[in-house]
């Protein structure tokens, strides 16, 4: 029986010990799942920008980020492209997958959730990527999930945010530094029954990165003292 399970949904809902964040080598996390990681792990994002500035993020080099809290997930940052403007390449995926297979045990990774590498914003074919991921990951002896990105999949963080936001007065919302017109937009999103994830906020016109971070800060504790582990 295969140790790999394919899912379509929200990778942040995974119960696996480690989740994979696909990154470029120039310090940008501006779209899709990467933006979700940026907002959930702002300390990691700041370190990532610093590492990119110092040319420490390269293809085939994996960066394992750990929060000190025992119940926090680890994040494996996996470069799938050099620049965010350019497409991913299969050889980039293979370099990272080979490194993962060689090092996951010594790094203490006991279960992991991958996205379909390089397919959402990287432009690679889903079937080709799934085949190459199976080729390498079938060699591992740990539970593995592979997620196809679905921005509409339910997100527990969204429910927490919605409950918190709806309990706040307009005065409290303004005290967060969110402008009145942005509050109106967020209220509209919150009241739309078709929205069920934080991605619905990030994809809405009129809501910028700074406002998104303020929304995430409502429900996340960012007092991090991260441990960094290079592969």
Where are these regions (language model features)?
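Macrodomain-like recognition of ADP-ribose-binding/processing modules
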Residues: 1-231
